[in-house]
Amino acid sequence: MGACMSKNDEETEQKKRSQKIDRDLEEDSKKLRKECKILLLGSGESGKSTIVKQMKIIHLKGYSDEELTNYRPTVYKNLLECAKAVVNAMHQFDIQPADPSLRPYVEFLQDYNMEGCPPGQSIDPKVGTAIQALWNDPAKEQLMERQTEFYLMDSAEYFFTEVMRIVAEDYRPNEMDVLRARTKTTGIYETRFKMGQLSIHMFDVGGQRSERKKWIHCFENVTSIIFCVALSEYDQVLLEESSQNRMMESLLLFDSVVNSRWFMRTSIILFLNKVDIFKQKLGRSPLGNYFPDYSGGNDVNKAAKYLLWRFNQVNRAHLNLYPHLTQATDTSNIRLVFAAVKETILNNALKDSGIL
């Protein structure tokens, strides 16, 4: 009889334990179902908005035909900004086209603008002819030797290569055009998507100096920060202050983020972005010219490791730092990187919820 009672007690105890485990699992699952808040930070033009566009392509079924068409004015604007930057630099450095017959194209591009045109209007095809002719002229090499002395959008070469497709009357941007298109982020842009069992709420915050004071109310309960750095900006200056090196500005911003009291328990995912442009630049613009203590030549891995070391040096709070070399315009690269990032975010979410 006693043995029977004992057996029943044991079964009851086991059932209670099993129910508690089920409740705990359900509770853990609920905690994980809460949104993970991801803050995208970095200085202007570091690639944050491109990452958001990639999330739409990878996790939210991409862009509809209408959304692609809506990017047309932005692509036109970027193309003209790039063309005007080139012709203004030609004037600034007194560089003439090697072929004198191309000089009228320089004046044409300088004077052309689309302001006041109806929203659906196509760009003048002559813009394409002018850009193509000037970009294929030998004077381009002279100009590119002085690229650190003037501002030219990273996507300029892409848009110039694609110019005849862009100026066609029936032009509709494709996803690569959208990824390359640049609009200044002002304020805070939010996007939500699922990544496996995780619900992600991502905030893209304006990178220009004037935007930074608006970040503060985003800081509460952040699961992870993705901090974007454009590796290629080591030889560039700020749009807002032409005496300030962009990489030094990124380091200062990173310092203020990583050592902030708001982020004492947050891990930082560091995207060393624009590695493709960085690789192209190192040969013609040595990193050592801007960071005299660097001695690794134009080896891209040594150069990237050196810059990562510089970022680690300012991490006085000793937050967990997860670095990734990225090319934000390459969907397959970002897909791979985010497979690793997902693990980091998941672990942080588990820690935040008390499961780990």
From Swiss-Prot:
GO MF terms held by the record: G protein-coupled receptor binding; G-protein beta/gamma-subunit complex binding; GTP binding; GTPase activity; metal ion binding
Pfam families: G-alpha
Lipidation (S-palmitoyl cysteine): 4
Region annotated Disordered, chain positions: 1-26
Region of interest: G2 motif: 177-185
Chain intervals for the UniProt region annotation (G4 motif): 269-276
Annotated stretches, region: G1 motif: 37-50
Positions annotated to bind Mg(2+): 49, 185
Basic and acidic residues: bias regions: 7-23
Renumbered residue ranges of the record's region G3 motif: 200-209
Binding site for GTP: 42-49, 179-185, 204-208, 273-276, 328
GO biological process assignments: adenylate cyclase-activating G protein-coupled receptor signaling pathway; conidium formation; sporulation resulting in formation of a cellular spore
G-alpha domain mapped to chain residues: 34-356
Subunit and interaction comment: G proteins are composed of 3 units; alpha, beta and gamma. The alpha chain contains the guanine nucleotide binding site.
PANTHER family (UniProt xref): GTP-BINDING PROTEIN ALPHA SUBUNIT, GUANINE NUCLEOTIDE-BINDING PROTEIN ALPHA-2 SUBUNIT
Protein name per its UniProtKB record: Guanine nucleotide-binding protein alpha-3 subunit
